[in-house]
Amino acid sequence: MEFDTIAAISTFPGEAGIGIVRISGDEALEIISKIFRPFRKKDIKSVKSHTIHYGHIVDPETGEVYDEVLVTVMRKPNTYTREDVVEINCHGGIVVSSKILELVLKHGARLAEPGEFTKRAFLNGRIDLSQAEAVIDIITSKTMLANRYAQKQLAGVLGQKMKDLKNKIMELLSHLLALIDFPEEDVEELEREEIKRRAKDILNDIEYLIASSESGRIIREGLKTAIIGKPNVGKSSLLNALLKQNRAIVTDIPGTTRDVIEEYMNIKGIPIKLIDTAGIRHTDELVEKIGVEKSKEVLAEADLILFVLDASRDLTKEDYEIFDILSGKNIIFVLNKVDLPKKIDEEELKKLVGNGIIVEVSTVERTGLDKLESEIYNLVFKGKVSATEEEIITNARHREVLINAKKHMESVIEAIEKGYSEDLITIDVNGALNEIGKITGETATEDVINQIFERFCVGK
């Protein structure tokens, strides 16, 4: 596949020790030969692949030296894009790297679009679409566990899984086509039973992957953990204590928190998205009322609720009203302010909590926080919210595709059981095959491909 030559700054803009300008395409070596002056006189166009060269970037028209640089030459096909690639390592900072990029563009390159280097790697067959998505996940990973899964996907683990699944579906299709082409009444019933067995086997594989996607979402995006409670029970103090920094404003005035505050923390490799919410209560104050409504929206989407109660006060009607709207949620009851004289009725608390998890903490004295973190982690790994090393589906797009493939395979099994013709059954088998191809990119539409690469930054 032929493309023009593209270039972009691949490092984060701003003051830094090093900046990198990346060039990819057939004209990469020609362009660098015009603007690079190596200290050891050599023809940069004829140097060996994967070598580094020291010299100056110079404007050939004015003779002005832009910077002292290291130039890396990588020849196709053993490069990130499977094209000739040149990387200019210059001093960091917006001015130097921008001026070098301008010079590169002036001498024949085009400014790369977001994700275009990785898109070329995909279009040139170096990686599949799931591996391209893994690049984004590596860049945005919030913990080493999330990075580990993304690295597995980049290494092709998911692609191989899809290849194995695709082969199973193709074998099923070949059985069906054989029945269509060579119908024999005495063996047809046996063949249909074998086809049904294979279809169920494929369906089981797909269902296993779908089941893993909830754990994968948590590892990729974080466990959405809402800190809920009535005003002035210490929700913002709990957020600050868990983060070990003063992120939220804390006062003795009820209703201080008006908006939702989101921050990430890491518990043994699991990214935890902590969401501090406005205290839930009846109020006529407009801004606080909006905050309460936002709290209820967060509550509906949360994976886990930290329901904060005040140990220094009795349970109130507001506590019970909040508990009533938490039905069906994973809840840890956080009994805060245990450093103060305890006034909460223990029997009443037990009736409210039942068999639920209670953790006593003091955000003032920083006690009980390790216990709370352990309970959050245990909840993740006890199956209520699962996340195990074997799971590999971390992407919402992949989950949606697999759900569609599952529907096709369920239709295949139903059609076999109802005695439909092989011609009709093959329609859904081909449908499942088409869906699986969307994960690796073989059957993904151009719009889907473009949407994926638009999420990248320029230079990647």
Curated annotation (Swiss-Prot):
Q: State the Gene Ontology terms under molecular function.
A: GTP binding; GTPase activity; metal ion binding
List localization entries: Cytoplasm
Keyword tags? Cytoplasm, GTP-binding, Hydrolase, Magnesium, Metal-binding, Nucleotide-binding, Potassium, tRNA processing
Textual note on the cofactor: Binds 1 potassium ion per subunit.
Binding site residues for Mg(2+): S236, T257
Per its UniProt record, what SUPFAM superfamilies does this chain match? Answer: P-loop containing nucleoside triphosphate hydrolases
According to the entry, every stretch annotated as the TrmE-type G domain falls at: 222-381
- The positions annotated for binding K(+) are N232, T251, I253, T256
Any Gene Ontology CC annotation: cytosol
Q: Which cofactor does it need?
A: K(+)
| Pfam families attached to this UniProt entry | MMR_HSR1, MnmE_helical, TrmE_N
tRNA processing as UniProt keyword: yes
EC id: 3.6.-.-
Keyword check for Hydrolase: yes
GO process terms (BP)? tRNA methylation; tRNA wobble uridine modification
- From the UniProt annotation, give the residues forming the signal peptide: none
Which positions in this protein are listed as binding (6S)-5-formyl-5,6,7,8-tetrahydrofolate? R22, E87, R126, K460
List ligand-binding residues for GTP: 232-237, 251-257, 276-279
CDD domains in the record: trmE (cd04164), TrmE_N (cd14858)
User: How does the annotation summarize its subunit structure?
Assistant: Homodimer. Heterotetramer of two MnmE and two MnmG subunits.
Report the sequence similarity comment from the record: Belongs to the TRAFAC class TrmE-Era-EngA-EngB-Septin-like GTPase superfamily. TrmE GTPase family.
Record protein name field: tRNA modification GTPase MnmE
Supply the source organism for this entry.
Caldanaerobacter subterraneus subsp. tengcongensis (strain DSM 15242 / JCM 11007 / NBRC 100824 / MB4)
